Amino acid sequence: GDFVRTVGIPKDFAKAVKILAAGHRRRIDVGRIDYVSRDGSPGVRMFANIGSFGMSGLTDRLVNQSKKRFGSLSFFAATAKAMWQYDNQRVRLSFDDAPADGVDLTINTVAIANGRYFGGGMMVAPDASLDDGEFDVIAIGDMSMTDFVLKSRRMYAGTHLSLEKISHRRARVVRATPAEPGQVVELDVDGETPGILPATFTV
């Protein structure tokens, strides 16, 4: 999985067992998300890897809806469907409890990253560290689906941070709200869609 890639556990079963048997321990950061459930009630989730929102949230919802119908093809089918259904959304982000530092963005996806990988191997946050006390915040901006597909290879390779329409910063607290009234921006937390924005991400 994506988190396993970050911590460096090999796919080979025997090698993975050997590493686990060695008993090495590492203290890592854990993220907390305070968000709004679909019924309007407050929700809380903890995560070790990445929380995100935008197209990633729609993709996860479609994956979970299609698993029974498509089985192992569900992720690819849902991703393709999400790419054509999703319209980029406007959100407002503020960092470290400083509203004056906020920015309005039109986004495809924003990843609040403790780990480096999500989406089945995409190295969305190549500089993220599990124990530095901060999130890496990667905003994939107002990118067309054609651009997204053409640049996806660089996102999987982790060489995308210098691309136009992709921004990167670090923060301990990230607040995200829809910039337009009534807009539904879906969350993605380790492959699940627990709710929608507004949300606060805290290390």
What kind of feature is each model-predicted range?
Residues 27, 87-89, 106, 112, ...:
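A generic structural signal for well-ordered coil/turn residues at beta-strand boundaries
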Residues 41, 58-60, 120, 147-148, ...:
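Short acidic, gly/pro-rich beta-turn/loop elements at beta-sheet edges
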